[in-house]
């Protein structure tokens, strides 16, 4: 029996203030000023629920908790839902693609 495809990749816009974090800047040497800064993740939850959990500090990434502004569904909705393995691979692929476009990207 095939497993239900219920995993999601999601992208959260981060405030430009995240650029004051040295670790974020070091991980994004090809960042193009003016491009968005984002967090890319994957979850078995609805992306809206996962974003709310990040902001509430529940299993959250510090950059999302402190700098997260909103979800960017135009960058991920076409992919979802998918299997765990597909989501794991797609999360990496989306991060690489966005970095290649000059975005500042954080992935846990």
Q: PLM features: residue spans?
A:
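Aromatic/basic micro-patches that form nucleic-acid/chromatin recognition or nuclease catalytic surfaces
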Residues: 45-48, 52-108
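GIY-YIG nuclease catalytic motif and its immediate N-terminal context
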Residues: 1-52, 84-94
């Amino acid at each position: 029996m095939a497993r239900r495809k219920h995993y999601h990749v999601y992208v959260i816009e981060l405030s430009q203030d995240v650029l004051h974090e040295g670790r974020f800047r070091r991980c994004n040497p090809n960042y193009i000023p003016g491009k968005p800064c984002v967090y890319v993740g994957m979850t078995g939850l609805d992306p809206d629920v996962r974003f709310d959990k990040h902001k509430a500090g529940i299993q959250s990434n510090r950059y999302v908790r402190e700098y997260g502004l909103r979800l960017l569904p135009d960058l991920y909705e076409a992919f979802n839902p998918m299997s765990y393995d597909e989501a794991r691979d797609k999360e990496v692929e989306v991060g690489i693609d966005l970095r290649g476009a000059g975005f500042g990207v954080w992935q846990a």
